[in-house]
């Protein structure tokens, strides 16, 4: 399955620190009238900073893949301080990661109702539409995000837009978006794989090889690119050149699915 990049910034967003000052202290409490008052139900005291604490806890849990636990924290934060767009965006991300797309859309929509220019939420909503196969709506959101020249994660959005076009078999538009995603610095690894895929579909195997070699230079730690190079070289009939790449996959990640595939290709499975 082609992975979706739902803006890495969305999952690592720094929640703004809140500093509260109080003019009253334990040593000098505020004076109060001494006349007797009628008894009334005490009003629960809610610490507004507790909402931020829950959001931070939820973010950590979400980054650890504990989405149900993260949702509990975000929901508690929303109960204490409702109407926070960042909180709705985080809840939407949890649901997106769980494949619960309707719930994800609901929260991204709420985030955008609260803050219409919330670019992270719009990109995440686009990723949700893409996962649901609603390609036109996904394209609309991604194009809108790219219209924000201040957004620091445009490469990931270009990758998402490229996936949208690729699913429509619009190879030219997809290639253009993926090429924008690999512009240095910090190119998107998966964009290289998709570009190599397009080149192969067009019968341009030599160009696919160049793209994969560039990916391997930029991402030497990624086992998958060695596997893709080995597979491509086998397709080109260059068995002797393919073998070292496939052997490298097995050496780097012997217990992985990539290694199983490499062994099968080498005839050692």
Predicted features and spans:
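Terminal, low-structured helical/coil segments at or just beyond the last alpha-helical repeat
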Residues: 28-45, 219, 223-269
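Structural marker of alpha-solenoid helical repeat scaffolds
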Residues: 46, 80, 114, 148-150, ...
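Canonical tetratricopeptide repeat
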Residues: 56, 89-90, 97, 124, ...
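Residue-level recognition of tetratricopeptide repeat
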Residues: 50, 84, 118, 152-154, ...
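Structural signature of tandem alpha-helical TPR/SEL1-like repeats
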Residues: 65-73, 98-110, 132-144, 156, ...
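Alpha-helical segment of the N-proximal tetratricopeptide repeat
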Residues: 47-80, 97
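TPR alpha-solenoid repeat register
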Residues: 87, 121, 155-157, 191, ...
């Amino acid at each position: 399955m082609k992975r979706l990049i739902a803006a890495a910034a969305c999952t690592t967003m720094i929640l703004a620190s809140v500093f509260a000052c109080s003019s009253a202290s334990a040593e000098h409490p505020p004076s109060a009238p001494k006349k007797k008052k009628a008894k009334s139900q005490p009003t629960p005291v809610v610490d507004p900073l507790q909402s931020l604490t829950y959001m931070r806890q939820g973010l950590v849990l979400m980054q650890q893949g504990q989405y149900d636990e993260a949702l509990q924290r975000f929901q508690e934060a929303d109960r204490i301080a409702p109407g926070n767009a960042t909180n709705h965006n985080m809840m939407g991300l949890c649901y997106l990661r769980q494949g619960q797309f309707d719930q994800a859309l609901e929260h991204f929509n709420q985030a955008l109702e609260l803050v219409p220019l919330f670019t992270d939420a719009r990109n995440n909503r686009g990723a949700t539409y893409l996962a649901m196969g609603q390609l036109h709506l996904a394209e609309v959101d991604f194009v809108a995000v790219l219209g924000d020249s201040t957004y620091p994660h445009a490469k990931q959005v270009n990758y998402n837009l490229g996936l949208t076009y690729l699913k429509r078999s619009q190879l030219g538009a997809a290639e253009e978006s993926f090429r924008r995603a690999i512009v240095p610095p910090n190119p998107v690894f998966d964009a290289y794989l998709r570009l190599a895929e397009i080149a192969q579909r067009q019968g341009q195997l030599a160009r696919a090889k160049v793209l994969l070699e560039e990916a391997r230079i930029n991402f030497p730690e990624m086992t998958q690119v060695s596997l893709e190079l080995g597979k491509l070289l086998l397709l080109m009939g260059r068995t002797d050149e393919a073998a070292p790449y496939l052997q490298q996959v097995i050496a780097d990640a012997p217990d992985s699915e990539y290694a199983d595939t490499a062994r099968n290709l080498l005839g050692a499975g």
